[in-house]
Amino acid sequence: KEIGDTDEDLYFEALIEKKKLNFTKSIEIVSSLENKYPDNLIIKTTIAEVYTESGNVRKSKDYTQRLLEISLGNYPLSYNLANAYILEEDYIAAEQILEDIKFYRPVDINLLKDLSSVQKNSNNMLGYHLTNSEFLFYSGRYEEALRDLQEARRIARNNFKIREIITERILILQTYVRPRSSRN
């Protein structure tokens, strides 16, 4: 079936143009839809995402922040703002936003992967190893998760409270990682 002239078809066409990296065409289409549906948050979020993906970071951040004033804590908008900060290499700002999102989505493995990457880039190695261990755990990679927790414990050697929490996690995780001979 060919793409027609319905609004749904136009929106789909805008997404296709975005995937093809034809950002100008994509913005034209979704902007026309925004004019027709000025209160549609999905269309507005798509515009913000196109700005980010096209590298128009300043416009993306301004537009996204205005939308977040209306829809505080909106997941796709918050993630988009974090991505804009990542493009600017402002990893600390991106980390703060992703940490806020993590509070509401603690087992979202894509979020955990992105957050650990941002923490590594911001040189927050303790945060990186803790978050990466969560990502690995929820991905079923228990031995790798255990190694990350052990590295986090090493980094936190002077913070006894954090070491205690990490040690508890290690003990729990060790129940998932059994010697191969005892698994049979």
Labelled PLM ranges:
Residues 1-66, 97, 141, 151, ...:
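Extracytoplasmic and endomembrane cell-envelope/extracellular-matrix remodeling and assembly machinery
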Residues 103-132, 137:
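Intrinsically disordered, low-complexity segments enriched in Gly and acidic/Ser/Thr residues
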Residues 36, 70, 104, 121, ...:
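Structural marker of alpha-solenoid helical repeat scaffolds
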Residues 11-12, 42-46, 62, 76-80, ...:
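Alpha-solenoid helical repeat scaffolds
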Residues 52-53, 80-83, 87-89:
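Small-residue-rich helix-loop
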Residues 55, 75, 89, 123-126, ...:
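Short coil/turn linking the two alpha-helices of tandem helical-hairpin repeats
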